[in-house]
Amino acid sequence: IEEQAPAVFTMLSKLGQELYMPKGILTQGAEAKEKAHKFNATIGIAMENNSPMYLDCIYDNLKAFKPTDIFPYAPSSGKPELRKAWQAKMLKENPSLKGKLISMPVTVNALTHGLSIVSQMFCNEGDYVVMPDKFWGNYRLTFSTISDGVLTTFPTFHEGGFNVDGLIKKVEEVGKLKPKVIVILNFPNNPTGYTPTLDEANRIVYGLRNLADKGIKIISVADDDY
């Protein structure tokens, strides 16, 4: 990352800059799933009739799936075929990503776990985290209590719509104090359920890009749980 995307590297937290995928059992296990067609000695698992052993009372509710697809250990970052299909969907729905260097998506154990990973990878003590003033407590726990980030909010609504100007003004304000800013874009907003109009979405993109062009390092987090 430091060589191919130095700007991104500087946005990572101290922990994020040191994280790596260990080349032990996780890597070897992933390679074995792909290449070990006869023997796989990387994992201990009880087999019966060339299939993982399981309880009938569990499989009775999962007949739509093959036992080999649901009972063995799942890869830590998600099943490769799911991740590839997910990336293909992203590229289809976002043509502007074509030709860009992006990573394969990874799976997480629900929303707060995903936010926690983002927080660990990008948020240092004292980093500003900008979000609307309508939010649930898991944001405070994840970005403030755990990562020691500074939560700063703006009024969610203005004149019956999303407060785009308030968002941009707040990012610019804290960006002058510290040039790295984490922006949480949670749409549909939880708990209000509000989704920006197309015009509001375009104004958000334009405003954030304009601030980025001025030198503010913006980490835009799309929290789209729905």
Show which residues each predicted segment covers:
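Walker B catalytic acidic pair
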Residues: 224
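N-terminal small-domain helix-loop-helix segment of the aminotransferase-like
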Residues: 14-109
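Conserved core of the PLP fold type I
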Residues: 67-220
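Conserved PLP-binding active-site segment in aminotransferase class I/II-type PLP enzymes
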Residues: 1-21
